[in-house]
Amino acid sequence: MHSPLRLEDSYSGKTIALTSDEISMYVCGITPYDATHLGHAATYLTFDLINRYLLSAGAKITFSENITDIDDPLFERAIKVGTDWRSLATDQITLFTSDMTELRVLPPHSYRGVVESMDVIIDYVETMKARGLTYTLQGDLYLDLSQCPSFFEDLPLPHEEAIRIFGERGGDPFREGKRQALDPLLWRKSEANEPTWRTSFGDGRPGWHIECVAIALSTLPDVGRSSITIQGGGSDLRFPHHYMTGIQAQALTGKSFSQLYIHCGMIGLDGEKMSKSKGNLVFVSRLLEDGRNPNAIRLALLARHYRDDLMWSND
């Protein structure tokens, strides 16, 4: 590849040059219940720019993106609006792909949901269980991090801070009976009114991180020293999601998951963090309905360093 791209790894802080002619890239996709807000758009525009540069430099790039179509927020929203979670997911995926087309984002080679990846997920969980890497707690299956020493050796933040952030971002560090506060959930037992799959280790559905492990490893070619070249997403995924994904993939393959972790900044609105809880999300589709030029939206979101946060204003 001519003109290698140099990017900073989010964990090591080192600048790494991508010199290989073959690149694989996995970017975490949406949970299809509230798409597409500007935070989504900024993330996928960032990786669209990386994708386009690598293509123009002569690299053969394989790009995969997931759809988190099994997740608590999706089920909660479906109940709130009185619809089936599958219908809600389908509608939101359609809206998201339309928004990405308007913003001129090149589609990934693989765009795969959790539901259609369930056989692979179950196989990977069974493999970890057979290797003695898991334990059961009241019907739920956890990864035993004491069997993964590199987790604590390479932890990218102080242990107590990791526990706090883990709890804020979907983890359960204080659940009684866990061996380690940071042990991640691999499989949760089935609950009423939720989708469930029958397995040898109990009926239920997967945890968040193993979903991305399965989709990434099953849709991207192995690149040698690591399983993939680039793992990407918003900076809110740096920990725990991407770190946990890397540890679980390493437990399966015996080598590092990604050569390079890339995280882009967050989008705020009028001086505040943009979030669902604040109710201040700005949606691409509504901007387009109001007559905003999609190329102007693209330019505005790319007019910053990709790692920097951006404060959006509707003025």
Question: Where are the language model's segments positioned?
Answer:
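Charged, low-complexity surface patches
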Residues: T43, A89, S117, R205, ...
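Alpha-helical recognition segments enriched in aromatics with Gly/Pro capping
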Residues: M1-Y33, D48, V120-D315
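Short, glycine/charge-rich beta-strand/loop segments that flank catalytic centers
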Residues: I67-D71, I93-F96, L106-I121, G139-Q147
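CE4/NodB-like, metal-dependent polysaccharide N-deacetylase domain
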Residues: D91-L106, S110, S218-S227
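N-terminal, positively charged nucleic-acid-binding surface of large information/translation enzymes
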Residues: S12-R104
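General small-molecule cofactor/ligand-binding pocket signal
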Residues: T62-S64, S110-R112, I262
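Active-site-adjacent, His/Asp/Glu-enriched structural segments that form or flank metal-binding
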Residues: V81, D99-V105, I121-R131
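The substrate-binding groove and active-site-proximal loops of carbohydrate-active enzymes
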Residues: A78-W85, H109-V115, G234
